[in-house]
Amino acid sequence: MSNGMKLPVVEEFFSLQGEGYHVGKAAYFIRLGGCDIGCSWCDSRYSWKQGNHPFMDVSDIVKKISDFNTDSVVVTGGEPLKWNLDYLCDELKKNNKKTFLETSGAYEMSGTWDWICLSPKKNMPPIKNAYELANELKVIVQDSSDFEWAEQNRRLVKPDCMLFLQPEWSKVNIIIPEIVEYIKCNPVWRISLQAHKYMRIP
């Protein structure tokens, strides 16, 4: 892992959060390159190969954010924890930004975070401390077998962790009714819809 002063940036954009607990809130997004988890339904495959994306100085990344009217910064991927995020978070905090992480939890934690959204993947499950640190658990549901996977993960997070089931986008119309019925029977869960896709924004 590098010292984190340069990071492979796939894209940066200012938009609204579209998933989970903070849906609808304005935020600046930083998508980092590199992911070896390989989810079949991934909607950001273009981010997987880190070599395809230029390394940028963290100072330049942070400087750009000052042009936008938000105090919230979401770091996503790819799998952002492939990289040392300590320096990025330090610089964001110096600029009074709130830091949000979207991760599979498969790699060691780095960085200082105000909110961690853990989205576990079966083919590369989270490490133990990811469960301990998660503020939000978001499980992608492709079919009914994923409800048991969701419950396995729920048992590992903190009691106050927010719990979300999110339909896999290509099957959204098929799987939403199943999620609705599941939540009616298991009301500790909430549904997360990818609102940004409905709004056709990044």
Residue ranges of predicted features:
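A short beta-strand-turn-helix
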Residues: 16-20
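Conserved Radical SAM active-site core
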Residues: 7-14, 26-27, 33, 38-113
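A generic structural micro-feature
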Residues: 22-24, 131
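Radical SAM enzyme core and accessory elements
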Residues: 1-4
